[in-house]
A protein has these predicted regions:
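Alpha-helical transmembrane segments of multi-pass inner-membrane proteins
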Residues: 6-32, 48-52, 58-105, 110-123
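Aromatic-anchored segments of alpha-helical transmembrane domains
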Residues: 14-20, 98-102, 140-147, 250-262
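A membrane-periplasm/extracellular boundary helix in multi-pass inner-membrane enzymes
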Residues: 17, 21-27, 121-163, 182-185
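Interfacial juxtamembrane loops and adjacent helix segments
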Residues: 26-55, 195-214
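A conserved mid-to-late transmembrane alpha helix and its immediate loop/hinge
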Residues: 58, 62, 102, 106, ...
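Transmembrane alpha-helices of multi-pass inner-membrane enzymes
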Residues: 73, 247-256, 262-281
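Hydrophobic transmembrane alpha-helices and their immediate junctions
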Residues: 81, 87-91, 114-123, 129-136, ...
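Long extracytoplasmic/lumenal interhelical loops at the membrane interface
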Residues: 151-221
């Protein structure tokens, strides 16, 4: 896990430099056509630098996917976050990931990060030892969440709901309602992943981009499938942190992190589904 953190920190550090270079110091970009997609404007051949206004996407197809990677890798060190004395060897790498997350300007990422940090504060070794300080720690955690909630990025997304046009907020709301309808129609087995009946149902109920991975999985594979995956993730987290409430905080952060993306990005989710011989490599 430390190798993964280290390499992601290196990638994020370079990505931040390239993005700042592009946004403020004139680094150019080349439009790359991709079959079946609209293509991307890439800087230095690898970095997706023009997704939205000054938003960091790194080498990923959009900032929303990048924040999922950042949140899930941060979660590998949640146990250390609960005891700051063990966090020092990883602190500089996690700080780079935090800066990168802020630069994604992702609403889902901000809220997920707020929940992750809130859980770390409330369930920290210091907080559990000094239980009388729990109200103060809870207030501090809520203040962090409120600060992120009132950020320009989040408030702009919320304000979009009042505009009668195709934008991120309205598209995702339409997707959620359509996918929820599909889940309600076939809650146990779903419509099948990638089947014609699933695609027909998405079109019928008004899903534009299938932007909620959890609901999409439930609509295609059935609710029991998604619940089973979430139980496995929770069990894995609890084995690592040994605190049920802390595990719930991190699980909730993971759910929200992926609630605005069309896939559940299992290469990262698998880190919390399967058991590994060691967490160190």
């Amino acid at each position: 896990r430390f190798k993964l953190l280290k390499y992601l920190a290196y990638l994020s550090f370079i990505s931040i430099i390239v993005q700042v270079w592009h946004d403020y110091f004139g680094l150019g970009s080349t439009f790359v056509n991709i079959p079946g997609n609209d293509g991307w404007a890439m800087s230095l051949y690898f970095f997706n630098t023009e997704w939205g206004e000054n938003r960091l996407a790194s080498i990923f197809w959009e900032p929303g996917q990048y924040q999922i990677v950042l949140i899930f890798v941060m979660g590998l060190f949640y146990k250390e976050m609960l005891d700051p004395f063990t966090l020092k060897p990883y602190l500089k790498h996690l700080l780079i990931l935090t800066i990168a997350l802020i630069m994604t300007i992702s609403t889902s990422g901000y809220i997920a990060f707020g929940i992750l940090i809130s859980g770390a504060i409330v369930n920290s070794a210091y907080g559990r030892k000094h239980i009388y300080l729990l109200p103060l720690l809870s207030f501090l955690a809520f203040s962090i969440f409120l600060l992120l909630w009132n950020s320009d990025a989040v408030q702009k997304k919320i304000a979009q709901g009042e505009v009668n046009e195709e934008n991120s907020f309205n598209i995702r709301m339409a997707d959620n309602l359509a996918l929820l309808t599909m889940v309600g129609n076939k809650p146990v087995f779903g419509y099948g992943a990638g089947t014609k009946s699933a695609e027909d149902a998405k079109n019928k109920f008004g899903s534009i981009s299938q932007s909620n991975g959890w609901l999409r999985s439930a609509a295609e594979n059935g609710t029991p499938y998604v619940l089973y995956i979430l139980v496995l993730i929770y069990s894995s987290i609890k084995r690592r942190v040994h605190i049920a409430s802390a595990a719930l905080f991190l699980l909730f952060a993971f759910i929200l992190s992926q609630s605005g993306e069309g896939n559940t990005y299992f290469p990262y989710t698998y880190m919390y589904v399967f058991k590994y011989c060691t967490q160190q490599t």
